[in-house]
């Protein structure tokens, strides 16, 4: 569990005092760096090695002062030495480092000064030893507090899809396919996210594969199966003689690891593919794209077009902002200086509920939950009056994934939607931890979204969530003009629009409007918004659809073109 930022700052001050007079690289570099990691409560020996031997481009051997594979390289110099040269020396080691072990950060120091390079963001920060305590948050990646900004077109999304896709193809080639393959890959994706987002310890999953499985891959599957069993077993129910490395993994719960799957099998290539997946920084992949990533893994033709097959965050926000977010944000601005009203508003946020009756992999639900949690974080800031020194436990974090409901006709997108909401919940918990300097995590998983695997057009939505308990309906149902509908879809439309003359010319998406209107009749306070074809508001469809909706009390609140 990460230390609080206040504790880290106190340790940084002591560290600066203790090392104020040190100057010799040869004499004290290792002790200095051990103490540096201790500032963040991380035993250096657990994550990083000294004097890592490396072969440089000129064929000579070099020795890296400290290497935390995939994360950090440190080059330590004596006081007064040139930090530019130290940085160049560090970069010269890179050709000899395996791709999956290439660090994101370089830190160079001469005891008196530190300079940190973030190679992915192209940024550098320099400060004196005495100012270390003011700069500890630069090292959130060590402490376990790192937060990430996401880019929808980030190349890591495509790279992740391609690497997981290759592993998917290999498993499928050996006959491991269908339901079991999909579940297996969801579990692997969860583990990959988990070790880069502080659900697991950093590199915990990768180290298990790298250190405990043979290079030929023969025992990789049994180790993974043992891990899945551990993740589904409470600490007090685990074997007393359980392998120590396996026993260090947390209890996850949440049903993701509950099903007993048939045995898989790995070879050298497949083990290497899994390690290649581990080498990516999965914290950079937003849970909002988790579902689309999974779908592209399952379909090779989608991998290069990741992003073309899901609704972008920009378009999701165009729907959810006028549906509920703008109104909530405006109310927050009006009351943020009134503590009692703010507390009541906080309770109100936790009572809001959301249904996506065509949820797919959950993109709309995930973004809606993220925005709800970000608003809750603003409420907590206002209640705390900007002081980030109090224990987060005294802030009742009320919003949770069980406020979200979905219906999805395909089984595994439904599973993905639930998993993606858990991942977003965890990442928002990390935002809270970062904000208030105390580690906040919800493990084992106690609550989950309600995602029904079924046909939304043949399902009574009241059986999922009662109308009187629902606040909003949202989503992106399938469109489908009359010439593109399947036999099943035609039957669904006929059942939904029974008695409506001419309904056969309507686009398929209109069936969700009719279902929503029927449902909302039991609670007129519900608001709904769907991504739709513009043809439902023009031409021959208008005279058929809208009289039917208007007589059911439907009013148009907003629309985008």
Regions found by a protein language model. Give the residues of each.
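Preference for the N-terminal adenyl/adenosyl cofactor-binding alpha/beta module
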Residues: 2-16, 130-371, 403, 407-416, ...
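Soluble or luminal CAZymes and related metallo-dependent hydrolases
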Residues: 85, 159, 508
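Short, solvent-exposed positions on alpha-helices
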Residues: 23, 27, 179-183, 526
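Short amphipathic alpha-helical segments
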Residues: 6, 26-34, 186, 291, ...
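Nucleic acid-processing catalytic cores of prokaryotic defense/repair systems
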Residues: 1-141, 152, 156, 168, ...
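Short, polar/flexible loop-turn hinges at active-site or ligand-entry regions and domain interfaces
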Residues: 78-82, 97-103, 122-127, 146-154, ...
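Conserved beta-strand -> loop -> alpha-helix junction used to position metal-binding or nucleic-acid-contacting
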Residues: 104-116, 127-139, 399, 443-451, ...
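SAM-dependent methyltransferase catalytic region
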Residues: 45-57, 305-559
């Amino acid at each position: 569990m990460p230390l609080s930022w206040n504790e880290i700052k106190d340790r940084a001050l002591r560290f600066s005092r203790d090392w104020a007079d040190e100057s010799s690289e040869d004499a004290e570099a290792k002790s200095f760096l051990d103490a540096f990691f201790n500032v963040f409560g991380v035993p250096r020996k657990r994550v990083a090695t000294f004097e890592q031997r490396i072969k440089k481009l000129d064929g000579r051997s070099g020795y890296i002062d400290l290497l935390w594979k995939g994360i950090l390289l440190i080059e330590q110099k004596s006081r007064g030495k040139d930090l530019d040269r130290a940085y160049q020396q560090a970069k010269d080691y890179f050709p000899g480092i395996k791709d999956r072990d290439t660090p994101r950060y370089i830190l160079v120091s001469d005891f008196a000064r530190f300079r940190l390079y973030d190679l992915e963001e192209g940024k550098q920060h320099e400060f004196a030893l005495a100012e270390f305590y003011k700069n500890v948050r630069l090292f959130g990646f060590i402490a376990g507090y790192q937060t990430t900004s996401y880019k929808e077109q980030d190349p890591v999304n495509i790279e992740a899809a391609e690497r997981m896709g290759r592993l998917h193809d290999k498993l499928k080639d050996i006959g491991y396919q269908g339901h079991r393959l999909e579940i297996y890959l969801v579990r692997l994706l969860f583990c990959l996210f988990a070790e880069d987002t502080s659900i697991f310890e950093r590199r915990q999953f990768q180290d298990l594969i790298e250190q405990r499985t043979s290079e030929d891959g023969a025992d990789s599957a049994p180790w993974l199966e043992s891990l899945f069993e551990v993740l589904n077993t409470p600490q007090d129910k685990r074997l007393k003689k359980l392998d120590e490395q396996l026993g260090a993994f947390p209890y996850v719960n949440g049903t993701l690891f509950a099903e007993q799957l048939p045995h898989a099998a790995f070879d050298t290539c497949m083990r290497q593919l899994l390690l290649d997946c581990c080498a990516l920084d999965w914290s950079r992949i937003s849970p909002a794209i988790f579902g689309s990533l999974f779908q592209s893994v399952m379909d090779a033709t989608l991998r290069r077009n990741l992003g073309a097959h899901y609704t972008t965050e920009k378009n999701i926000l165009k729907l959810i902002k006028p549906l509920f977010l703008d109104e909530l944000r405006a109310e927050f601005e009006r009351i943020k200086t009134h503590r009692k009203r703010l507390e009541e508003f906080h309770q109100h946020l936790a009572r809001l509920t959301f249904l996506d009756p065509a949820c797919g992999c959950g993109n709309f639900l995930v973004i809606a939950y993220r925005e709800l949690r970000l608003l809750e974080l603003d409420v907590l800031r206002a209640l705390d009056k900007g002081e980030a020194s109090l224990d987060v436990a005294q802030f009742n974090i009320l919003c949770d994934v069980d406020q979200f409901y979905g219906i999805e006709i395909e089984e595994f997108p439904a599973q993905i939607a639930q998993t993606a909401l858990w991942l977003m919940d965890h990442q928002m918990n990390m935002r809270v931890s970062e904000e208030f300097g105390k580690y906040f995590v919800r493990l084992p998983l106690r609550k989950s979204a309600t995602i029904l695997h079924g046909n939304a057009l043949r399902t009574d939505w009241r059986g999922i969530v009662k109308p009187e308990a629902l606040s909003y309906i949202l989503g992106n149902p399938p469109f489908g003009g009359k010439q593109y509908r399947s036999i099943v879809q035609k039957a669904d439309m006929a059942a939904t629009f029974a008695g409506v003359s001419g309904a056969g010319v309507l686009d398929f998406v209109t069936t969700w409007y009719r279902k929503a209107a029927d449902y909302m009749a039991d609670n007129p306070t519900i608001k709904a918004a769907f991504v739709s074809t513009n043809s439902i508001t023009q031409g021959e469809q208008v005279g058929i659809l809208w009289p039917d909706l208007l007589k059911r009390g439907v009013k148009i609140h907003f629309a985008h073109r």
